[in-house]
């Protein structure tokens, strides 16, 4: 019966107010967050939430949607939240055998927003976490 089922466990995680851009860059997020109460609908390992701005990750991640992020190491094909030269981006990660890092837009009509980092490029790249999605095909 309905009353025999345990209540869904609720918890709070930070929802960052500064969006991660899926397309054009957004400013880096810091202390500007609100606590979001989540339940069993949210993946268990989610450590934070980020609102997405832009269309470069559609149709998998829509403009203005909220994604859930953990701190698991990224593997090629994973989607992550990145700080690139001081701006926040949501992109699909790929690293080749030479150490070149590619950040892809899943919406290939927005390939203009792809980023490439070669060794010695002098560009700053930090990963803030892995977006919790099912495996997606690389857009190559």
How would you describe each model-predicted region?
Residues 1-63, 88, 120-125, 133-140:
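Short, positionally conserved secondary-structure boundary motifs
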Residues 79-80, 90-95:
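Short beta-strand-centered aromatic/proline hotspots
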Residues 61, 74-75:
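Short, well-ordered loop/turn sites that connect or cap secondary structure elements
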